[in-house]
A protein has these predicted regions:
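Beta-loop-alpha module in the N-terminal Rossmann-like domain of NAD(P)-dependent dehydrogenases
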Residues: 14, 19-81
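A contiguous active-site-proximal alpha/beta segment in oxidoreductase catalytic domains
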Residues: 69-148
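Short, Asp-centered acidic motifs that coordinate Mg2+ and/or phosphate
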Residues: 3, 38, 118
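A structural signal for well-ordered alpha-helical segments within the folded catalytic domains
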Residues: 49, 53, 76, 99-103, ...
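Short catalytic-loop micro-motif centered on adjacent basic/acidic residues
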Residues: 41, 62-65, 90-93, 200-202
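Rossmann-like dinucleotide-binding domain that binds NAD(P)(H)
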Residues: 141-220
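N-terminal Rossmann-like dinucleotide-binding module
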Residues: 1-20
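Acidic-histidine catalytic/liganding microenvironments
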Residues: 33-34, 85, 99, 197, ...
Length: 220
């Protein structure tokens, strides 16, 4: 780790000292640093597009957390930038697509001649001991200004509005956040296995305000 950047001064200082890395209050200065080869973007979703675009334009390889952007407009800009720099590796953090279990599943599906009639995916969220034991204790900070928080919330709301339209409801926003925050992992996995869906057949509510979607895929 060569350099780090964070919106919290105390968090930035702590991480820089822990990993003996340079500290940048301005992330755009970090991506321009000559000793930085690749950039990991782990910021809130609403900053992914700007940081990734800046990194690509600075000639850096990019790993950006999911969702890569919150609206199509920003995604198209990133795709154009990535295509203009074929020498760079740019990827989104869909780690499930690289797990041994998933790769084995993909191999088995490809080698089986039987037609797939139905696929069902579940997301299990558990910050259990297996994961927590591999991480350091949380380092909490309380020095992020109200102005920065307000700007972040405003930016996020604006990008979701651009994606859904001005007349979108709070319920639609919540559903969209669930899709981009968690559901995108499942969608990325099933797309890797069977390709792009051709239509959304139905959407209906279940318990605890959750939503279930039926997608139709062109499975042979």
């Amino acid at each position: 780790i060569t350099a780090v950047s964070d919106v919290s001064p105390t968090q930035l200082k702590h991480i820089a000292e822990t990993y003996r890395a340079k500290a940048y209050a301005d992330p755009y200065m970090l991506v321009k640093a000559p000793d930085v080869d690749a950039v990991f973007i782990c910021s809130p979703d609403q900053y992914h597009a700007d940081y990734a675009l800046a990194a690509i334009e600075a000639g850096k390889h990019v790993f950006v957390e999911k969702p890569v952007t919150l609206c199509i407009e920003d995604l198209e800009k990133l795709i154009a930038a990535e295509k203009a720099h074929p020498e760079l590796v740019c990827m989104v953090g869909y780690m499930r697509r690289y797990s041994q279990g998933f790769l084995k599943c993909k191999e088995l599906l490809a080698s089986d001649d039987r037609k797939i009639e139905y696929m069902r995916f579940r997301d299990i969220i558990l910050e259990g001991d297996f994961f927590m034991d591999q991480t350091r204790p949380p380092y909490l900070c309380s020095d992020i200004s109200d102005e920065v928080k307000a700007e972040s919330s405003s930016r996020r709301r604006d990008q979701i509005t651009r994606a859904l339209g001005n007349d979108c409801t709070d319920q639609q926003r919540t559903t969209y956040v669930m899709l981009t925050g968690l559901g995108c992992h499942t969608l990325a996995a099933v797309r890797e296995l069977v390709g792009l869906p051709v239509e959304v057949e139905s959407v209906f509510p279940q318990v605890m305000q959750s939503r279930t979607c039926h997608y139709c895929f062109p499975i042979q």
